[in-house]
């Protein structure tokens, strides 16, 4: 299959620039993956589509305020750092702009000097290996000095950092939010549990590979970036019990989906596990664990659009996306949602 098979026309004004004031009042497009039938709802109506045997699998990762603005110690020139991946306690793989000023040995200052950094090596695809120096707790300093690493298509400033976190976020480490989860409120989750639906949590730390375009014509040649995941015993048991009792495993977001499919065996069973995944799901892939998916609307020609096409069929997805454009749904990270059932 070619990348161009996953292209669609999207007017720029449909790219959501800010989150909904009430998380669960975004719109919801419901797509039947067997028939291609479409319904138009509000996100909190998701309750009507869940049954007591089902389980929702949610990614409890928390976004780091990983964008730091600092200056070069030697010249005072302004620099932008984006933390990608922790390598050791105070050593990170980092994107640094402008890169030409970030040679090995270069030092940088952030805030009033409470955080300093030195480039100690070169990473993949132009990234830098950076060691940070500070007194106190790194996460607290980052919280104070860092900004949310919003995707490049969001131009507006985010007033409240928590609006780019899910209400159940817990495990710090992502460079982007698992955006399907942004639609849930604590009240909606409570109602879902009261209905007898099980909630199961796993962790996948979202990397910037999520936003990287596919640069090859033939999708099979694309290589994914690896991301860290973990699933505990309790979550594995909930998922296996759901399968045994004839319920559906409903992934909340493509990150939960990719984690489940990484861990699942040929029979759809999962177990306690952690590691790095670079799974690339595209049409032709047979899902082992995931029965249904809650997800946002993705970028044209993106790996995430290919993932949903593998679940519902490319024609069904492309048709649903064209309908969503026609009906002026809001797209991407702060946009509306889709339930593939």
From Swiss-Prot:
Q: Highest taxon of the source?
A: Bacteria
Q: What name goes with this protein?
A: S-adenosylmethionine:tRNA ribosyltransferase-isomerase
**What keywords appear on the UniProt entry?**
Cytoplasm, Queuosine biosynthesis, S-adenosyl-L-methionine, Transferase
Protein's cellular compartments = Cytoplasm
Q: Identify the Gene3D superfamilies for this entry.
A: QueA-like
Q: Which NCBIfam families match?
A: PRK00147.1, queA
List the coiled-coil residues: none
Q: Which GO terms describe its molecular function?
A: S-adenosylmethionine:tRNA ribosyltransferase-isomerase activity
Query: What family is reported?
Result: Belongs to the QueA family.
Q: What is its EC number?
A: 2.4.99.17
The broad enzyme category this protein falls into is transferase
Biological pathway: tRNA modification; tRNA-queuosine biosynthesis
> Could you list the residue ranges that cross the membrane?
none
Stated role = Transfers and isomerizes the ribose moiety from AdoMet to the 7-aminomethyl group of 7-deazaguanine (preQ1-tRNA) to give epoxyqueuosine (oQ-tRNA).
Q: Which GO CC terms are listed, alphabetically?
A: cytoplasm
Q: Which gene codes for it?
A: queA
Q: Which reaction does it catalyse?
A: 7-aminomethyl-7-carbaguanosine(34) in tRNA + S-adenosyl-L-methionine = epoxyqueuosine(34) in tRNA + adenine + L-methionine + 2 H(+)
Q: Which InterPro entries match?
A: QueA (IPR003699), QueA_dom1 (IPR042118), QueA_dom2 (IPR042119), QueA_sf (IPR036100)
Give the GO biological process terms.
queuosine biosynthetic process; tRNA wobble guanine modification
């Amino acid at each position: 299959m070619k990348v161009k098979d996953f292209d669609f026309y999207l007017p720029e004004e449909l790219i959501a620039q800010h989150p909904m004031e009430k998380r669960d009042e975004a719109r919801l497009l419901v797509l039947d993956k067997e028939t291609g039938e479409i319904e138009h709802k509000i996100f909190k109506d998701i309750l009507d589509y869940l049954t007591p045997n089902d389980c929702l699998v949610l990614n409890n990762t928390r976004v780091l305020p990983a964008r730091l603005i600092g200056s070069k110690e030697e010249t005072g020139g302004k620099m932008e750092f984006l933390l990608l991946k922790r390598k050791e306690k105070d050593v990170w793989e980092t994107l640094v702009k402008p890169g030409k000023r970030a040679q090995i040995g270069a030092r940088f200052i952030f805030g009033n000097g409470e955080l300093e950094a030195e480039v100690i090596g070169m990473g993949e695809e132009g990234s830098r290996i950076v060691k940070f120096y500070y007194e106190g707790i790194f996460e607290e300093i980052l919280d104070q000095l860092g900004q949310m690493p919003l995707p490049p298509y969001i131009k507006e400033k985010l007033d409240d950092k928590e609006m780019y976190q899910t209400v159940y976020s817990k495990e710090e480490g992502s460079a982007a939010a698992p955006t399907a989860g942004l639609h849930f409120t604590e009240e909606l989750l409570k109602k879902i549990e009261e209905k007898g639906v099980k909630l199961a949590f796993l962790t996948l730390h979202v990397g910037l590979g999520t936003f990287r375009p596919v640069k090859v014509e033939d999708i099979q040649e694309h290589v994914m970036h690896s991301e860290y995941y973990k699933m505990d015993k309790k979550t594995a048991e909930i998922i296996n019990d759901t399968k045994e009792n004839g319920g559906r495993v409903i992934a909340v977001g493509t990150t939960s989906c990719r984690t489940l499919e990484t861990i699942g065996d040929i029979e759809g069973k999962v177990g306690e596990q952690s590691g790095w995944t670079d799974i690339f799901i595209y049409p032709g892939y047979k899902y082992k664990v995931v029965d249904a998916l809650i997800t946002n609307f993705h970028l044209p020609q993106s790996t995430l659009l290919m993932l949903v096409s593998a679940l519902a069929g490319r024609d069904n997805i492309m048709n649903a996306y064209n309908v969503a454009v026609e009906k002026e749904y809001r797209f991407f990270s702060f946009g509306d949602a889709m339930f593939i059932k």
